[in-house]
Amino acid sequence: NHCLTVPMNSCSKTLPLFKVDNMAYDLKVFYTNTPPAGAYQGYGTPKGTYGLMMAMALLAEKLGIDYKDMVLKNHVEEGYMLEILKGLGEGREGAVVPVGSCGLDEAIRKGCDMIEWGKKEVSSDPDWKIGKGFAMIMQGSGLPGLDHAEAIAKLETDGTIILNSGGADLGTGLDTISAKIVAEVLKVPMDRITVVSGDTDSCAFDTGAYASSGTFFSGNASLEACKKLKDMIIKESAYQMGEDEGDLEIRFPGEVYSKKTGKVLSYYELSHTACSGGGHGQMIAHGTYITTASSVPYGAHFAQVAVNVRTGEIKVQKFYALQDAGTPINPEVALCQMYGAVMKSIGHSLYEDMKLDENGVCMNANMTDYGVPMIWEAPEDFKSVLIDVNDAYGPFGAKSISEIACNGAAPA
């Protein structure tokens, strides 16, 4: 069951947003006669974010301080030691680590400019009242110290690359991420790369596509495999070309070039010779990634909401999601992930509701009655913005992107 990990996430992925060491957290969990719950994006963090951000907004109002100024003064920044984590382990003392790459300040400032924070909006209809709000958010990139990913990269005799990745693409675009990593390291076109993923019969072990681990863990394993394969390619090329390894480099569209003599050897020629008795056999590399380092994505979500005080109708007029995902490997899909996750967040904040009878039986267990938001209920002005920072641990500086976007709608 999830009775410990979910409520612990509601604090461990919210409280570290603030530079405050004087914190306390207590929780109680209850077993109820209701349908069992499974893991879902956010995994406790949306609830904790809602509680913390609402408390901070109310505190700012009580103190007569602009919420923006309060947040900018107190949010964490790169290098700040997160002492709070010591008390947020699950059944044991947590590890204290510093904040890594963090685009939080830029996200807040840029978002406030976009939504014109401080400017009061007034509707021409007196029944409609308009308000603005925002929330800081954070999540994780897999589970450091627990997650484990592996990948195998090999050069085929036709000069193409096959990557066997244990990470499963659940619609997140992980296969494309993996292919882009191969293309970048080995300098080959995307159409000469085949990704085989999530197949336990042919792929190496991967803990799983959960907890925002795909790009960070599976991607890093693919990166490691490709780096090793690159070294093998250089070594085999030096043998076949009669060159020193230090004089060789790989270049697009998949060939080895001698800076000293100008000789060129294509991957096709290299691999064909290596597997035809004139070399040292097929080049296959195995990459493994485990880490205790934590690469946390940060963000700020902004909303402008209109409420009809006579009928209770709610309209989300504007929603701006600004997120630091490190250096995104696939920016187009990253933005799409943000839009989708924000809509889910708006859904469980405003529309969705499990109606239970006195025996705990769900009365609206279908998509018609449950209340999933429709396309016409999307914000009228809806924008996702990537805050570009470089992360020291992610593949090519990337961090996770989608799950964090479930956390901001309710408090914003």
Task: Describe the predicted segments one by one.
Residues 1-48, 125-412:
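Gly/Pro-rich active-site capping loops and adjacent beta-alpha segments
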Residues 66, 74, 290-292:
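Domain-wide signal for the mature, well-folded portions of proteins, strongly enriched
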Residues 72-154, 364, 372:
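Accessory "access/gating" subregions that flank catalytic or transport cores
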